[in-house]
């Protein structure tokens, strides 16, 4: 999409909850976004890659956000399977 000056701009792109696939609307101020950086085991420095998790306010309100983050990180291999 172009604005009045002719520059290309992006439209609003809503985020989706990583746990429930719900759309997170603009007024959901209880939602959180966690970015976990990959760390090089040899040097201990953060690599250029990271993994992002978004949890909507409804999941946080139910008190299930910690279980969702653990489940998602186990699936991605960040946490051990026997955690």
UniProtKB/Swiss-Prot annotation:
Keyword line: Cytoplasm, Endoplasmic reticulum, Ribonucleoprotein, Ribosomal protein
Domain of life: Eukaryota
GO molecular function per UniProt: structural constituent of ribosome
GO terms under cellular component: cytosol; ribonucleoprotein complex; ribosome; rough endoplasmic reticulum
Predominant localisation class: cytoplasm
Protein localization: Cytoplasm, Cytosol; Cytoplasm; Rough endoplasmic reticulum
One GO term of the biological process aspect: translation
InterPro entries noted in UniProt: Ribosomal_eS21, Ribosomal_eS21_CS, Ribosomal_eS21_sf
Subunit structure: Component of the 40S small ribosomal subunit.
Family: Belongs to the eukaryotic ribosomal protein eS21 family.
Record's protein name: Small ribosomal subunit protein eS21
Gene: RpS21
């Amino acid at each position: 999409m172009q604005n009045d000056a002719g520059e290309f701009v992006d439209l609003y792109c809503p985020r989706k909850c990583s746990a429930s696939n719900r759309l997170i609307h603009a007024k959901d101020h209880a939602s959180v976004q966690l970015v976990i950086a990959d760390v090089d085991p040899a040097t201990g420095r953060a690599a250029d890659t990271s993994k992002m998790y978004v949890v909507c306010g409804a999941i946080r309100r139910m008190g299930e956000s910690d279980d969702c983050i653990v489940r998602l990180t186990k699936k991605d291999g960040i946490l051990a399977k026997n955690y």
